[in-house]
Structure formats: C-alpha cells, structure tokens
Amino acid sequence: MKVRPSVKPICEKCKVIRRRGKVMVICENPKHKQRQG
C-alpha cells in the first residue's frame, strides 16, 4: 500500500474508488495499491 498525495491508475486494471471518504486505487497487482493520505 502506497500512501501519496495524488493517486493515479498505473495500469489498465487499476480502479479508483472511495472508501470512508478516502480515495484509493485497487488492482490485481498488489504493488499498485494506493491510498490518498
């Protein structure tokens, strides 16, 4: 899980979602998981 100020999809399988007011990227590649901090 990477915590960064701006989250962007890295590959075509990355999805940008909102969970509890936080913007997150989920992907089948675990390295692409991101959360907005």
From Swiss-Prot:
Keywords: Ribonucleoprotein, Ribosomal protein. The keyword Ribonucleoprotein applies. PROSITE patterns: RIBOSOMAL_L36. One of its GO terms (cellular component) is cytoplasm. InterPro entries: Ribosomal_bL36, Ribosomal_bL36_sp. GO terms for biological process: translation. Coiled coil: none annotated. Pfam families: Ribosomal_L36. One of its GO terms (molecular function) is structural constituent of ribosome. Belongs to the bacterial ribosomal protein bL36 family. HAMAP family: Ribosomal_bL36. This is Large ribosomal subunit protein bL36. The gene is rpmJ.
